[in-house]
């Protein structure tokens, strides 16, 4: 073994890239370390493409091993199971910047596997995994127009931009941004922020790109020392005769089809034209395959749409570059639910529902850095009917998890603190129609549904997706892109925020040469679009509802003496269990005596409050209580008048007349009203029944005159 090791300083961290010692049968393998966090990144590429392969089969798998943090997995099987949401999101984070760097026409299968084998608790391994993947691809010899660098950026007003901040530093940061790019271009941005202005966000992107050049340089040096020979791969030659034939016979018809503004009608017409082209050019006796015809047909579609946009002609649906599609905003659309909204923008529609629960409904997340609870969940569902198709239903896909997380980032900064609003919140966005930017429709719908549920958001949030078409003779930034514009364009740029600033920014770029000017233009257009959408939303609901829905759980916090906690819980939990069973409420008790009570309705809540007040109540001199006789003795009776509290009614306090036998007046189990007369220094309570009885009328006549 002759391992090659490359070390370099990256901000406050030392990065180590090592190859040639582990996983030597992979096409490329690098053990990347950042401090005490290590990720083994491997790349395997198939030397030959599968016959008939017409797309690039790239798969990226990021996996966190429990042993990396010195843990044993939970569960019955005690081994890692299906990917967690964090693993899925990081897999997408690695995939997005590397995918556009493989050359057009390269359809050999490539698999990237990143395994976290050692982890510090205060460092997210994702940046280390991205750097390791870049290095593994660079030394593999697989055709790849890299390498890439990656950086996480934080921001505080006091310190400015922070490079690769730890979890502790991020806790006080107003920004959490991940940027990836090559030596010359930014390729991907993923971020959440606390209402930061556009210039700060753009500055963070440029700062990250500048700092990541250290990574690009180090990976290039590693590839020079340890790289394998570059594959002898050439793209298939263009069949110019086929291109010319399709242009001559179908270019005009395709152009007319792209004037049809209705998505389904447009798709039907294009499908019809595609079938005609296949029948005409790939029929019997032809050496041209159906796939070849469809591929060239698709490129012709792309060229037609792009050239029109750059030339300033109307877009597919007739809009100019800055117009947002017609909006329709509704709230309170569903009965029984806690909050709901229907947000429609053109042919994209999201039905969003907000549900409130108790603290115990929070999601428990067992991560490498330790276990924590999450009291806000946003789930995004994209059923096949939303695009008029039949399709697979079942487990949540990577795309749905990624879009849900983006929508969550947009809204999360505006949520109230847990001590102000102690509910667990779950938002579900059902995409019922889709033609572009359903994740941003989910942001708008989530904001509306949460306000409809009475959640005190700091400000309403809206989101918009921007696109880009860039040609040699100019570029056009498109506001509120359609699905076709996303597919045929060069950039997907999503911005969510309030009227005051940006809360989430996601950018995926398919080409090099995106300049600062283009990003500035996109952010400026996105701001105008966001303010327009917010004005439409505010016309329907501008403030959170003053009270929660009647269907939402009711909540009350009370403080008790910590010494009383054991009385509320009871022996083996019997008392608290009886309260929850009788009232239907759920109760959480903190060690400091804070009691949080959640009831399904007002009656449930009040019932639980009353029971706890009874249990924790202290006897007060002069107060009247309803009690039950629990024991009779010669000198009086003991009466239970509060949970766990008995007092003595002395024989002299039973009646106004002289009492010879207590049993003539009282029986065990009898309910009586008693008045608290005194509590001595030893805590013994003296009660009286006599004090509550009417005074007897005096007998005997008046004096004679």
UniProtKB/Swiss-Prot annotation:
Its cofactor is Mg(2+). Keywords: Cytoplasm, Magnesium, Metal-binding, Nucleotidyltransferase, RNA-binding, Transferase. One of its GO terms (cellular component) is cytosol. Transmembrane segments: none annotated. It is an enzyme of class 2 (transferase). Its main location: cytoplasm. Coiled coil: none annotated. It catalyses: RNA(n+1) + phosphate = RNA(n) + a ribonucleoside 5'-diphosphate. Residues 622-690 form the S1 motif domain. The keyword Zinc-finger does not apply. Its EC number is 2.7.7.8. Component of the RNA degradosome, which is a multiprotein complex involved in RNA processing and mRNA degradation. Involved in mRNA degradation. Catalyzes the phosphorolysis of single-stranded polyribonucleotides processively in the 3'- to 5'-direction. This is Polyribonucleotide nucleotidyltransferase. It comes from Teredinibacter turnerae (strain ATCC 39867 / T7901).
